[in-house]
A protein has these predicted regions:
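Flexible, glycine-rich phosphate/dinucleotide-binding loops
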Residues: 56, 78, 98, 144-145
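Structural motif
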Residues: 26, 48, 90-92, 110-111, ...
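N-terminal positively charged helical leader segments and presequences
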Residues: 1-84
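Fold-independent oxyanion-binding glycine-rich loops
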Residues: 30, 51, 72-74, 93-95, ...
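RNA substrate-binding interface of SAM-dependent RNA methyltransferases
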Residues: 102-148
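Residue-level signal for inorganic ion chemistry
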Residues: 29, 91, 128
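Acidic/glycine-rich phosphate/pyrophosphate-binding loops and surrounding catalytic core
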Residues: 84-106, 135-138
Length: 148
């Protein structure tokens, strides 16, 4: 059971200002959460999920260190979700520090300038990932990539 305080805290991470202050962001949905966990590039702080999702992924979750795993009900996930219909899992991850020393030798680097729509930015990132582009640089005028 999520407390009101914790619910409000998770909801506050939907705002860029709080994401920047805390260095945390929310990931929603089974595929996104599992992709981030499997990448081992992001530290997972908390997972909120339905019982059946937790049981299905129990082996993977047992390997996580310092991650608080909380069983949640549908209505609780709906409260903390930014989506109109909540998924079976929502997780809180640490944002990565920007890497200003990008290894560009023999690699394609995608540079984005003033992409202001978070949905468009997310689409570009997913397509770049599909094509194997590892380096993406966003100008200061771009949307928050943790909101894409």
């Amino acid at each position: 059971m999520l407390s009101k305080t914790h619910t409000k805290y998770i909801q506050s991470l939907q705002h860029k200002k709080l994401r920047d202050e805390t260095g945390l962001f929310i990931a929603e949905g089974p595929k996104v959460v599992m992709d981030l966990l499997n990448s081992r590039k992001f530290i997972c702080k908390e997972i909120f999920a339905l019982n059946n999702w937790l049981q299905e992924h129990s082996k993977h979750l047992s390997l996580l260190k310092d991650t608080v795993v909380t069983e949640a009900e549908d209505f609780e996930l709906q409260k903390i979700s930014s989506l109109s219909t909540a998924h079976a899992v929502l997780a809180v991850f640490e944002k990565r520090k920007p890497d200003y020393k990008i290894e560009t030798a023999f690699k394609i680097t995608l540079v984005l300038d003033t992409i202001q729509d978070p949905g468009n930015l997310g689409t570009i990132i997913r397509i770049a990932d599909w094509f194997g582009i590892e380096n993406i640089v966003c100008s200061t005028g771009c949307a928050d990539m943790y909101n894409a």
